[in-house]
C-alpha cells in the first residue's frame, strides 16, 4: 500500500553503518583461515531394503569452526521417495529438535518422529550396515525417475539425478579445494551449495523480487525475508518469501524440467552465479523437496501437491477493479463509479484504502467522510448494479483505550508479546499491537471482528496489507540477543539492514513460545489463512482475500498483487516476470497496480499499461496519495483503449474462469511463460516480455514509450489475432515477427489447436454471464483442436464438487478433406441448462484457402437437423491463406452434447 517510502539512500546508509558498530566481527577476524566450515563425514548409513524408498545417515563434523557460532556436531539426513515424482532430503540436528514449519501450519507429509533420547540403538543398526564404506550409496526405486546418491567422501555430499537422461539435477558434491562447497550446519547459519551445468540450466523463481527478466540473471544474491519495501526497487527482498525454483534444461532433452523447494521459513540469502546455487539460511533445518516433472506444468502440479492447491476465486474477481489511496470521502467513490459508467468502461469492483477508517482503525468507518448511512447506500447501489466493494485491513490494532477491537483483543489475550507483554509497534493509527495468528483464540477474535464489520457494512472482500509485518519504528535489540542480531547478516534491503529494522523484533514471542525470528515470513500466510476461514464461516460463499505478504502455500488462501510499484516504464516491464513468478509459486490470481502506484503516471504509460493489465489474472488500477488521478476515463485515448481491451477480457471471462478451475484442481498457473506450452523451443526460455493465458492465448504488449510496433516471438504454428480474425502469423519454426502496435492496440493471438468458449461484452461480469456463448474454433494443421469450459454460480465455496451445481464441457474439432466436425462432451450439464446458456455462434479459423463450405448439420441427442445456409458466412483472411467461417443463430444448449458438421 502506502507506507512512508524508505529512500534506500541516506536513512538506510546510516542504519547500515550503525550495524557494523554493534554487529559481530567479520569472517576473517573470527577464523584466521577465513573458512566458515569444514563439512561432515558419514558415520553410518542405512537404506530401507523393504520399500527401497528411504535412506538415513548420520554425518559427523569433520572439524570445528568458530565463525557464526559453534557447529552442530552430529546431523541426521533422511532421503525419502515420498512419491514416484517427489524426493525429499531432510537434514537436521541428530540430537536436538530444531524449528521447522509445523504440519498444522503447512500440511504435508508427517515429519519424522523426534530423535530418541538415546541414539545407541540407532547407531548399532546403522553401523552394522555393510554400505558404510562404499563411495556412493544409492536410493532408487524402479517406479521413480529420481535417484538420490550419498557421496561418501570426506566431507560428504549428495546428488539428485534423473535416471532416464542420466542428468544430475542437484549436485551437492563438495569440491575439496573449495570450502564454500561444504555443508555447514550452525544454529543460526545453514550453508548448502549445488553446482549447476552452466548454460544448460535455466532457473526461475526464488522470490519475491522485482526484476526485468523472468529467467534469473547470473551473479546475484536473492534474499528472502518479508519486508515493506516498494516493489519499484529491483533486486531487493520484497513482501514475500518463496524459496522454490524451477530449472528448465536445454539438454540432454530440451525442456526437461524439475523443481526444488527449500521448505524453511527463516530468512536467507540464495546466491546464484550461473554455475552454482548456494543457500545461506539463518535458522531452521534443510528440508528439500525435488519435483521430477519432467514438464513445467507437471513440476507446478507436484509442487502445489505439497504446499497446497490455489484457492478458487469468485467469478466477479476476474472483472476490472479500481482503487486509490486518497479517495477522500464517499462522494468521491460515487463520482468514480459514475465516471466509469459514463465512459462505458467496465467496472466490477470499487476499492477503498485506509481512507475509509476512523483514525485508521480497523473495522471502523470515518463518521465524517464515510458515514455509515451514506456508505450503506453506496454499497447497496453497487450491489444493485452487479458490482462489488472491497476494503483494506492492516494487522496493527490501535491501542486507543476506547477502541472496542482493542478492548476485546486484550480480553482474549490475542496479541504478540515481547518480554511477557504485548509488543508495542507503530503504524497508521499510531501505537498498535499485532494479533498473534498462531494463537487459537486469534481466529475467534479475528472472525468476530470481521463479523461485526460485515454486519455494519456488507463488503465483498478483504484486502490485507502491511503484513510483512510493517512497523514504522525499529525497536532496540535486546542486548546480547543473537535473534535480534544474528551472526550472519542476510542482504536485507540490498544493504544488509538489520533484520529488526522497521518490523517486529525477532525476539517477540508467538503462541507456543515460538520466536518471531522463526516465523516472520509466515505472518502474511497466517493472516490470510484466518481471514479466508472467517469469510467462509460468515458468508458461506467463496471468499476474496488479497494479501501483500505471502509464503509458499499462501495461494491456498489468497490472491496477491505485486505491491507498491511506480508509474514508470521499468515497472511496467517488471510486472510480467513478477506475475509469472507467482504463477510458479502457486498463487495464480496475481497482478500489478495498473498505471503505477507511486508517482504521477502519463497518458501514454497508462494507456499501454491497461492494454497489458487487462490480461493480468487480477486486473486493478491503483494509485497513491498525492499523485494525479489515473482512473481510466481521465484521458479519452486511455478510455478508448480500456473499452477495447476490457471488452476482449470480458468476452474471455469464461476462459479465465476455466483456467481458475484448472489452477485450483492441479496448480497450473493462469498466466504462463511461453515455455510451458513450448518446452522444446529453447528460444522461449529467455522471453520475459510476452506470456500465455492458458496454453494458447499469447499476449505481446508494448513496453517502451514512443513506439508503434513490437517484435514478438511466435513459436511454431498458425496464430490468429483475437481482435481481428482475418490477421494471422504463421511460423513453421519459432521466429520473431515485427507487429504493428499503434497507440490503441495490443497484440493478442490464439494458436491453432485451441477452442475458446466466450461470451459477450458487458459492463459487469453479472451482465456478461447472461449473454449467449460464442465458440471460437482454431483448426490445427497437425491434428485435432481442443477446449474446455467450467462454469458454476461463481460464488460457491468449492469448484466442481457438488454435482448439479456446475457444468464442465470439453470441445473437440477435427477436419478431413472438405469436412469439419465440432463436438461437445458434457459432464454435469444440468447447471448450464438451468441457466439457459446457449451457444449462439461458432467461428472457425485456420481453414485453408480453397476449403469449400456448402452447408452444415447439427445433431443434438438423437435428432439431426440441417442448418440454415443463410446463417453461414465464409470470408478470406487478409493474406489469402485462410478462410474465416461463421455460423450464427445456432441456439445450442450449452449443457447438452452436440455434433456440428460443416461440409
UniProtKB/Swiss-Prot annotation:
Signal peptide limits: 1-24
Pfam family, one: Glyco_hydro_31_2nd
EC number of this enzyme: 3.2.1.20
InterPro entries, A to Z: Gal_mutarotase_sf_dom, Glyco_hydro_31_AS, Glyco_hydro_31_C, Glyco_hydro_31_CS, Glyco_hydro_31_N_dom, Glyco_hydro_31_TIM, Glyco_hydro_b, Glycoside_hydrolase_SF
GO biological process, one term: carbohydrate metabolic process
Post-translational modification: Four different forms (I-IV) may be produced by post-translational modification.
Glycosylation-annotated residues: 64, 219, 400, 491, 501, 600
Family: Belongs to the glycosyl hydrolase 31 family.
PANTHER family: ALPHA-GLUCOSIDASE, P-TYPE DOMAIN-CONTAINING PROTEIN
Function: Alpha-glucosidase I and II have high activity towards malto-oligosaccharides and starch, while form III and IV have high activity towards malto-oligosaccharides but low activity toward starch.
Name of the featured protein: Alpha-glucosidase
Species for this entry: Spinacia oleracea
Amino acid at each position: 500500500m502506502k507506507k512512508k517510502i524508505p529512500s534506500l539512500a541516506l536513512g538506510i546508509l546510516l542504519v547500515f553503518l550503525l550495524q557494523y558498530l554493534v554487529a559481530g566481527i567479520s569472517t576473517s577476524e573470527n577464523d584466521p583461515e577465513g573458512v566458515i566450515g569444514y563439512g561432515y563425514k558419514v558415520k553410518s548409513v542405512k537404506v530401507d531394503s523393504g520399500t527401497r524408498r528411504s535412506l538415513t545417515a548420520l554425518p559427523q563434523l569433520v572439524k570445528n569452526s568458530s565463525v557464526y557460532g559453534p557447529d552442530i556436531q552430529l546431523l541426521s539426513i533422511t532421503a525419502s521417495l515420498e512419491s514416484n515424482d517427489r524426493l525429499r532430503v531432510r537434514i537436521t540436528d541428530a540430537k536436538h529438535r530444531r524449528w521447522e514449519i509445523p504440519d498444522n501450519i503447512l500440511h504435508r507429509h508427517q515429519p519424522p518422529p523426534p530423535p530418541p533420547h538415546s541414539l545407541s540403538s540407532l547407531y548399532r543398526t546403522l553401523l552394522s550396515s555393510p554400505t558404510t564404506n562404499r563411495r556412493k550409496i544409492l536410493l532408487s526405486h524402479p517406479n521413480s525417475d529420481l535417484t538420490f546418491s550419498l557421496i561418501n567422501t570426506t566431507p560428504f555430499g549428495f546428488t539428485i539425478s534423473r535416471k532416464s537422461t542420466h542428468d544430475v539435477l542437484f549436485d551437492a558434491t563438495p569440491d575439496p579445494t573449495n570450502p564454500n562447497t561444504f555443508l555447514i550446519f550452525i544454529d543460526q547459519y545453514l550453508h548448502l551449495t549445488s553446482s549447476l551445468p552452466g548454460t544448460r540450466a535455466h532457473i526461475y523463481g526464488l522470490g519475491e523480487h522485482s526484476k526485468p527478466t523472468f529467467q534469473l540473471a547470473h551473479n546475484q544474491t536473492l534474499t528472502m525475508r518479508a519486508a515493506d519495501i516498494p516493489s519499484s526497487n529491483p533486486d531487493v527482498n520484497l513482501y514475500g518469501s518463496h524459496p522454490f525454483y524451477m530449472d528448465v534444461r536445454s539438454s540432454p532433452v530440451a525442456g526437461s524440467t524439475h523443481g526444488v523447494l527449500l521448505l524453511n521459513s527463516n530468512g536467507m540469502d540464495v546466491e546464484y552465479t550461473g554455475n552454482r546455487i548456494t543457500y545461506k539460511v539463518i535458522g531452521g533445518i534443510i528440508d528439500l523437496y525435488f519435483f521430477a516433472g519432467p514438464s513445467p506444468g507437471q513440476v507446478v502440479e507436484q509442487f502445489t501437491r505439497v504446499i497446497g492447491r490455489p484457492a478458487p476465486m469468485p467469478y466477479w474477481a476476474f472483472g476490472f477493479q479500481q482503487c486509490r489511496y486518497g479517495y477522500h470521502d464517499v462522494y468521491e467513490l460515487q463520482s468514480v463509479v459514475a465516471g466509469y459508467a459514463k465512459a462505458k468502461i467496465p467496472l466490477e469492483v470499487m476499492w477503498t484504502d485506509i481512507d475509509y477508517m476512523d483514525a485508521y482503525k480497523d473495522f471502523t468507518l470515518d463518521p465524517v467522510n464515510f458515514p455509515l448511512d451514506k456508505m450503506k447506500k453506496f454499497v447497496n447501489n453497487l450491489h444493485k448494479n452487479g458490482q462489488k466493494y472491497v476494503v483494506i485491513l492492516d494487522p496493527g490494532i490501535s491501542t486507543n483505550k476506547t477502541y472496542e477491537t482493542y478492548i476485546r483483543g486484550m480480553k482474549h489475550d490475542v496479541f504478540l508479546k515481547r518480554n511477557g507483554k504485548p509488543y508495542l509497534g507503530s503504524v497508521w493509527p499510531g501505537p498498535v499491537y499485532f494479533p498473534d495468528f498462531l494463537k487459537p483464540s486469534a481466529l475467534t477474535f479475528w472472525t468476530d471482528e470481521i463479523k461485526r464489520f460485515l454486519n455494519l457494512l456488507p463488503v465483498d472482500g478483504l484486502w490485507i496489507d502491511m503484513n510483512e509485518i510493517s512497523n514504522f519504528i525499529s525497536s532496540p535489540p535486546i542486548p546480547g540477543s543473537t535473534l535480534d542480531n544474528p551472526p550472519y547478516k542476510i542482504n536485507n534491503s540490498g544493504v544488509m539492514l538489520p533484520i529488526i529494522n522497521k518490523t517486529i523484533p525477532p525476539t517477540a514471542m508467538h503462541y507456543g513460545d515460538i520466536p518471531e525470528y522463526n516465523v516472520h515470513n509466515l505472518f502474511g500466510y497466517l493472516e490470510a489463512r484466518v481471514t479466508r476461514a472467517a469469510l467462509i464461516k460468515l458468508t458461506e460463499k467463496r471468499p476474496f482475500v488479497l494479501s501483500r505478504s505471502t509464503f509458499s502455500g499462501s495461494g491456498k488462501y489468497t490472491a496477491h498483487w505485486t505491491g507498491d510499484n511506480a508509474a514508470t516504464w521499468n515497472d511496467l516491464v517488471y510486472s510480467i516476470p513478477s506475475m509469472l513468478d507467482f504463477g510458479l509459486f502457486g498463487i495464480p490470481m496475481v497482478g500489478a497496480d495498473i498505471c503505477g502506484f507511486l508517482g504521477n503516471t502519463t497518458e501514454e504509460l497508462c494507456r499501454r499499461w491497461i492494454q497489458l493489465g487487462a490480461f493480468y489474472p487480477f486486473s486493478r488500477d491503483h494509485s497513491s496519495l498525492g499523485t494525479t488521478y489515473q482512473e481510466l476515463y481521465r484521458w479519452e485515448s486511455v478510455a478508448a483503449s480500456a473499452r477495447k481491451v476490457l471488452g476482449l477480457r470480458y468476452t474471455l471471462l469464461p476462459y479465465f474462469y476455466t483456467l481458475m478451475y484448472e489452477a485450483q484442481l492441479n496448480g497450473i498457473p493462469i498466466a504462463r511463460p511461453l515455455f510451458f506450452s513450448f518446452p522444446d523451443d529453447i528460444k522461449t526460455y529467455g522471453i520475459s516480455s510476452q506470456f500465455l493465458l492458458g496454453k494458447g492465448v499469447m499476449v505481446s504488449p508494448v513496453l517502451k514509450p514512443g513506439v508503434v510496433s513490437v517484435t514478438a516471438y511466435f513459436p511454431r504454428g498458425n496464430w490468429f489475432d483475437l481482435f481481428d480474425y482475418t490477421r494471422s502469423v504463421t511460423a513453421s519454426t519459432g521466429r520473431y515477427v515485427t507487429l504493428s502496435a499503434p497507440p490503441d492496440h495490443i497484440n493478442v493471438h490464439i494458436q491453432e489447436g485451441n477452442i475458446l468458449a466466450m461470451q459477450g461484452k458487458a459492463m459487469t461480469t453479472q451482465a456478461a454471464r447472461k449473454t449467449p456463448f460464442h465458440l471460437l474454433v482454431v483448426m490445427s494443421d497437425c491434428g485435432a483442436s481442443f477446449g474446455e469450459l467450467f462454469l458454476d454460480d461463481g460464488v460457491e465455496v468449492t469448484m466442481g464438487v457438488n454435482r448439479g451445481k456446475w457444468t464442465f464441457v470439453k470441445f473437440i474439432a477435427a477436419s478431413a478433406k472438405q469436412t469439419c466436425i465440432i463436438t461437445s462432451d458434457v459432464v454435469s450439464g444440468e447447471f448450464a441448462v438451468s441457466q439457459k446458456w446457449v451457444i449462439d455462434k461458432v467461428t472457425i479459423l485456420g481453414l485453408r484457402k480453397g476449403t469449400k463450405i456448402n452447408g452444415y448439420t447439427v445433431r443434438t441427442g438423437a435428432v439431426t437437423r440441417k442448418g440454415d445456409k443463410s446463417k453461414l458466412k465464409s470470408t478470406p483472411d487478409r493474406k489469402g491463406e485462410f478462410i474465416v467461417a461463421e455460423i450464427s443463430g445456432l441456439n445450442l444448449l450449452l449443457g447438452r452434447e452436440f455434433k456440428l458438421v460443416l461440409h
